[in-house]
């Protein structure tokens, strides 16, 4: 917020999100379901449902969302706006309720790509308070770089990202057609293989379920030995859930039951293994991106 205000933005309010951000739909928020602005009664996606709906409806120019497993990208897709999940640590997460340090991302949601680039330029860069920013990536002139267009860009099409049993063939087709549009603008397409991409969801699950159960819920978002800024008001406010656990959403209850089962029966083994495998997966992506 501070960076946006310093850049001249006006803050008009807070958007509704899904209950504790644990839903990919738009039906679990505390006040009421968030309707898709293009058609009442249809999902706006989640968990940053309100942010996407407000931008799509033209109520705001810019909004901020959080993304641990699609929560910026899915509502952006459902509502027809541009949602950016930045590289981990590029945008400081300071002041946002943590879910799990390893997978916490926050980023811009806008009506256009140019607005998204400009907003990212304002938001990005170290703040000295967020331990996710250990690499210290600086902001870049994204809005200026965007004007160079797609000509000369080399785009890798990960073949393991297509043909999943649970994915829609129409969605796969849309992605490939979008790539061809970029090729028509001068980008170079290359099909690449990242075999470990196939186990990404299995790596993510213990980190999300066990990590969120422990860090977000039991430790009120921070816990002990936190290297970043403690937002004490957030810690105090969040702790109230323990006296009202019956009011938690069904999606969050399910996640906590799963996370607690793993913790009780496997003592963090699969969480630790997933963290180690995540490093290997990141290295696999970095390897192909280096080309």
Regions found by a protein language model. Give the residues of each.
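Alpha-helix boundary recognition
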Residues: 5-6, 55-56, 73, 217, ...
């Amino acid at each position: 917020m501070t960076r946006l205000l310093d850049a001249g933005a006006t803050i008009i309010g807070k958007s509704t999100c899904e209950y504790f951000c644990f839903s990919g739909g738009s039906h679990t928020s505390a006040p009421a379901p968030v309707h898709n602005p293009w058609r009442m009664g249809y999902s706006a996606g989640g968990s940053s449902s309100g942010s996407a709906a407000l931008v799509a409806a033209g109520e705001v120019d810019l909004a901020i969302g959080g993304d641990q497993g699609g929560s910026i990208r899915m509502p952006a897709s459902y509502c027809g706006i541009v949602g950016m999940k930045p590289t981990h640590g590029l945008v400081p997460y300071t002041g946002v309720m943590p879910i799990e340090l390893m997978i916490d991302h926050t980023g811009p949601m806008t009506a256009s790509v140019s607005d998204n680039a400009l907003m990212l330029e304002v938001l990005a860069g170290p703040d000295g308070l967020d331990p996710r920013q250990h690499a210290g990536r600086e902001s870049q002139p994204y809005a200026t770089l965007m004007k160079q267009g797609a000509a000369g860009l080399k785009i890798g099409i990960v073949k393991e990202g297509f043909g999943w049993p649970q994915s829609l063939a129409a969605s796969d087709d849309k992605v490939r057609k979008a790539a061809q549009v970029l090729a028509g603008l001068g980008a170079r397409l290359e099909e690449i293989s990242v075999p470990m991409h196939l186990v990404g969801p299995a790596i993510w699950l213990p980190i999300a379920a066990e990590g969120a159960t422990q860090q977000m819920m039991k430790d009120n978002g921070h816990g002990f030995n936190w290297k970043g800024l403690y937002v004490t008001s957030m810690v105090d406010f969040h702790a109230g859930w323990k006296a009202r656990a019956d009011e938690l959403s069904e999606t969050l209850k399910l996640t906590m039951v799963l996370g607690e089962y793993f913790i009780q029966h496997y003592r963090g083994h699969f969480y630790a293994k997933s963290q180690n495998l995540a490093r290997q997966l990141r290295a696999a992506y970095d390897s192909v991106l280096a080309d």
